[in-house]
Regions:
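Compact mixed alphabeta submodule
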Residues: 113-233
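Residue-level recognition of well-ordered secondary-structure positions
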Residues: 77, 111, 152-155, 246
Length: 250
């Protein structure tokens, strides 16, 4: 009996999300609802020409999220299956495909004013904030807002949905007019640049077979008490999901 293997399996089961355990507070920054925060986007240690990282995730299939294998230019069973469903022409399958396709999330390394002791962390946001930031950074009048000597801070505000009448909170970004250094000391700047982590390393990379099993479990859920598959309701004209799975993974 291998005791280490038993302990590893127990740890895996206890980690219900199935993903890599990460100290969220140490690695990520999330703006607080109803407040304004002042931050600085820091040049990326891993790509000095572009500070943002675009990653695609599956939500609701593997809890809490799964990093898509397409981020690694690797064959992805969920993406392949979603693509086949979309091409089927059947509306039910196309609706399911929409749920399965990975969603874009963007990450930027940031230095939060007032929380300098926490160093560089990652700020995660969606397409709308991303487009706004890219629009500002493409404007030559602003210059390089990430420049460590003469860049610009950004004010981030999260407006609660109840104030806007929208379904979700609204995040606004405003670039400060003054140009300022990232930090007063050169040694601090050097440390902020050199100690950054690679964002993709903070998430578990699933293997093809792992993702296939998770997808099959999501499509054909089993009862917790007996492991019996739930009854599937057939409908005329709908492509059989089981057949699709069999054809894809044969």
């Amino acid at each position: 009996m291998n005791l280490d293997e038993i302990k590893n399996r127990l740890a895996s089961l206890n980690n219900k999300g199935g993903g890599k355990k990460t100290d969220y507070a140490a690695n990520f920054w999330k703006p607080k609802e109803g407040t304004k925060s002042q931050i600085r986007i820091v040049p990326s240690k891993f790509n000095k020409d572009f500070p943002f990282n675009e990653l695609y995730f599956y939500f609701g299939i593997g809890k809490p999220r799964m990093l898509a294998l397409s981020n690694f230019d690797t064959t992805d069973p969920i993406l392949e299956f979603a693509t086949k469903l979309r091409k089927s022409g059947d509306q039910t399958n196309m609706d399911l495909a929409k749920k399965l396709f990975p969603k874009l999330r963007v990450f930027a390394p940031v230095y939060v004013r007032g929380e300098e002791d926490k160093g560089v962390r990652f700020w995660e946001f969606g397409k709308m904030v991303y487009q706004e930031l890219l629009g500002v950074m493409s404007d030559e009048d602003y210059g390089d807002i990430t420049d460590v000597a003469s860049g610009r801070d950004i004010t981030v505000e999260v407006i609660p949905a109840k104030e806007t009448g929208k379904m979700f909170n609204t995040t606004t970004v405003r670039v400060k007019p003054n140009q300022t250094p990232l930090a007063p000391e050169a040694t601090t700047v050097e440390s902020l640049l050199d100690t950054q982590k690679e964002i993709i390393s903070l998430y578990k990379k699933y293997q093809f077979d792992e993702m296939k099993d998770i997808l099959q479990g999501w499509l054909k859920p089993a009862d917790e008490d007996g492991g019996k598959e739930t009854e599937k309701v057939e409908s005329k004209g709908k492509v059989d999901i089981n057949a699709k799975l069999d054809n894809l993974f044969d």
